Design a protein with these regions (language model features):
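N-terminal leader/linker segments that precede catalytic domains of diphosphate-processing enzymes
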Residues: 1-278
Length: 278
């Protein structure tokens, strides 16, 4: 009997190890899947499991805020200044304080984005690169960080794109937070690199006087701006019926549409109204 049990013991152990070897990885994957609470986290995990990316793969990040500005059923868009010539929402990439650069380099080993020209006005943009292993902590850090542009004052891009160009002449604005659009982690065909794009959407809450100003702008013709319907934005300005085949509206503009509100996540209070001086 003793000999019989001794001979069977290694066989039982091997079978148990084989079963555990098959079950534990799947159990581990299931636990990881439960911990991934957002689509972008799930997309990152799939790329890692498929060996498409590793901890050291360089990821490009671009974090911005965009204004939803409506006049009637049309949205106010401004011309892009970086050479595309396309119309897009008022807004741009978040910026961090000068002192914050050293913290980002120390914590996440950030690298400047090499896909866009860098000058004094864009040196501290949240348009960066870093190793994939830092991405999750970086996004959590971004939401907690105060040494950057925050929801309490998003006047800079509004001022630069509308006030300083003489398009409108307002002393202050009010807006509310609508939500956040964040892409999956994916390979971007345009820049040929893995990237993740984040955009916080805010809606302008114009006064009656400001609504009148917007209506006056809509009645004028200008190369600096245009008003577009949701349908025009969704087709990027292309209208085959009228023979307009050039895509004059940037593809990220669809993020501000009211029709796409359901696609935004709520990262903060969306009922609070913020008022800032321009």
């Amino acid at each position: 009997m003793y000999i019989f049990e001794t001979k069977l013991w290694p066989v039982g152990t091997n079978i148990a190890c084989l079963i555990l070897g098959l079950v534990l990885p799947k159990l581990g994957n299931s636990i990881e899947d439960i911990c991934d609470t957002t689509n972008w986290e799930s997309s990152q995990r799939k790329l890692e499991r498929g060996k498409f990316i590793t901890d050291n793969t360089i990821i490009r990040v671009s974090f911005a805020y965009l204004y939803r500005i409506k006049s009637g059923n049309k949205y106010l868009l401004v011309k892009n200044e970086r050479g595309t010539g396309k119309y897009q929402p008022v807004g741009g990439v978040y910026q961090f304080d000068e002192d914050e650069r050293s913290n980002l380099q120390r914590l996440f080993q950030i690298i400047d984005d090499n896909k866009m020209p860098i000058d004094e006005s864009s040196r501290n943009d949240y348009r960066l690169r870093m190793g994939n292993k830092y991405l999750r902590k970086f996004i959590k850090y971004f939401d907690k960080q105060k040494k950057r542009e925050n929801i309490e004052d998003l006047s800079r891009e509004f001022r630069e794109e509308l006030i300083e160009k003489g398009i409108i002449n307002w002393e202050k604005i009010s807006y509310r937070y609508c939500g956040r659009h964040i892409t999956d982690l994916q390979f971007g065909e345009h820049f040929q690199t893995y990237e993740i794009l984040l955009a916080d959407i805010v809606e302008l809450l114009p006064t009656e006087s400001q609504r009148n100003d917007l209506k006056s702008l809509e009645d004028k013709s200008s190369d600096q701006y245009r008003f577009a319907t949701a349908e025009e934005i969704s087709s990027f300005g292309v209208n085959t019926a009228l023979g307009q085949f050039k895509d004059e509206i940037a593809n990220h503009t669809v993020k501000i549409l009211e029709e796409n509100q359901c696609k935004l996540s709520k990262e903060m209070n969306d009922s609070k109204v913020y008022t800032v001086k321009i």
